[in-house]
Amino acid sequence: MAEGEITTFSALTERFNLPPGNYKKPKLLYCSNGGHFLRILPDGTVDGTRDRSDQHIQLQLSAESAGEVYIKGTETGQYLAMDTDGLLYGSQTPNEECLFLERLEENHYNTYTSKKHAEKNWFVGLKKNGSCKRGPRTHYGQKAILFLPLPVSSD
């Protein structure tokens, strides 16, 4: 290889015949603020619970493209979404309100910013009591927006 040449590699999904973004196992999103797991309930309510055995905390993260993810409750089949007021809810179908920008922070936690409201920097967040924090009330540096993706235990 001559100096200055660039070698490119085919996408791993093509090379290993993996489905794009849907090969991950379900995860739990543990919030640094109050120790709650993000939960999507059958009625579309989004909140947090400390009950690790709750089936509604199992979430499937699937990549739309690099750094962009859909978050779907495996039990309810609903997608995490943020409306125009910054409220989190469960949506039956994926739409532009369901797409989030996933970012790995220096402290190894992840943050999820609404792609639709990216210019406003609205994050997914949970208060210490487990209720949702509205997008306009979130900002970088808060513990409420820090989530640690954990594997679902096989107990």
From Swiss-Prot:
The UniProt record lists the keyword DNA repair: no
Any single GO BP term: lung development
Region spans: Heparin-binding: 127-143
SUPFAM superfamilies given in the database record: Cytokine
Binding site for heparin: 33
Chain positions listed as propeptide in the UniProt record: 2-15
Annotated Gene3D superfamilies: 2.80.10.50
A GO cellular-component term linked to this record: extracellular matrix
Coarse class of the protein's main subcellular location: secreted
PROSITE patterns, A to Z: HBGF_FGF
GO molecular function: fibroblast growth factor receptor binding; growth factor activity; heparin binding; integrin binding; S100 protein binding
UniProt modified residues of type N-acetylalanine: 2
Modification after translation: In the nucleus, phosphorylated by PKC/PRKCD.
Annotated function: Plays an important role in the regulation of cell survival, cell division, angiogenesis, cell differentiation and cell migration. Functions as a potent mitogen in vitro. Acts as a ligand for FGFR1 and integrins. Binds to FGFR1 in the presence of heparin leading to FGFR1 dimerization and activation via sequential autophosphorylation on tyrosine residues which act as docking sites for interacting proteins, leading to the activation of several signaling cascades. Binds to integrin ITGAV:ITGB3.
Stated family: Belongs to the heparin-binding growth factors family.
Protein name: Fibroblast growth factor 1
